Amino acid sequence: MRRRSKKIKTENNSNPETSEERNKFDEIPHDLVIEILERLPLKSVARFLTVSKLWATTIRSPDFRKSYRGGSSSEPRTLIVSDLNFKEPNPKLHFFRPSISSPSFLSSLTCPFTYPRHEEYYYHHVNGLISVGYGTDQIVINPTTGKFITLPRPKTRRKLVISFFGYDSVSDQYKVLCMTERLRGHPEEASSQHQVYTLGAKQKSWKMINCSIPHRPWSWNAVCINGVVYYIAKTGEGMFRRCLMRFDLKSDNLDLCTILPEEIQTSLHDYFLINYKGKVAIPNQPNFYTYDVWVMNQEGGKIEWLKNITFTIKPRKGFVRYLFVTGTTHTGEFILAPTSYTDEFYVFHYNPDMNSFRKIRVQAPGVKFSFAQKASVVFSDHSLLRLDNLHIRGSTHTATGEFILAPRFYSDDLNVIHFNPDTNSFRSTKVEVYEDYE
């Protein structure tokens, strides 16, 4: 007997009205979409990743990440790294984000480093990530999650490695620049073995680059503006002339930018580079309470240094004795912070237009500022939004309706994020893998 095959009729259960409503989202003018998203808190922005591909692309774009303020244009975006006990192995790092309304604790992590006395830490912050260089060990940290990746060791036998960190928004690439020096006793000798590591590149190794300018880094910090990393160095005969070096992330070119003005050459204070309204600036301190801000102007192809701002902090109640200018906010305020703290920790914002100060206290649940003279590092203009590294995976949601978001890259641990649109909440889930994976 011949059997007939049973045909199963399938029906399209998609709701045409729902599809039409979703299409209406894409009809909203792009500028209006940006304006709406910029006024929303982070969790709401993450929720709108699921509206459409156009909205997801917009949210992950570098321009939106740069302009996003977390729902408030007046909210400070300072990032503070504290509890840096360099004299102990495997120091614990705490990341804080001070806020006018509710100061927040972001994360903590234990650095996988020991502490030989001849090595130093180098911290650099750019576009929401932090690089920490410690001798030949280099890691890159996401302070929002407390996760980090370990980079391969540079190609060198030397122990003293100085590193800098940069980001190019055009190519959406992070790069680490490092160079080596002899351990001690050779202050007049230039650095050598200049190498570059590109995060996310297929070739996970350091690339040697040429530098025709003999120089030796003088300041531990750097500033990255428009895909160029700037740092202060010594050059010339005997390494006595102080200059500004620049590293172009697009071309991997390292060269001399300009010589520092004489007023800064003779300063006895440490140099600290900041980004002031898109320009390289150096806050100089003639004395404990006075600050001169020198800004580098490159208009017309000619480089000149202008002393744009001078302000003084009068000793007053509630101010610690010695503050450093560590950066500026997106609203143009200068961030002043101590290098250490005791029972409490504060940062200060100075508004040059209003000639006014405001004091922001840093608090963290479960973390006490109870030990005297703990070291700290304060980064300005921290970008908390790193949604470009999260993507909806698999069937996009769980059986309970939660959306699954996973990172593009991982190191030792693999975690996925579950977002519940009903409760507007996130939870992190560690994925256990029992075989090798790439």
UniProtKB/Swiss-Prot annotation:
Among the GO biological process terms of this entry, one is:
defense response by callose deposition
Signal peptide segment: none
Q: Where is each F-box domain found?
A: 22-68
What Pfam families does UniProt report for this protein, alphabetically?
F-box (PF00646), FBA_3 (PF08268)
Q: Where is this region: Disordered?
A: 1-24
Xref: PANTHER family: BNAA05G37150D PROTEIN-RELATED, F-BOX DOMAIN-CONTAINING PROTEIN
Q: What is this protein called?
A: Putative F-box protein At5g15660
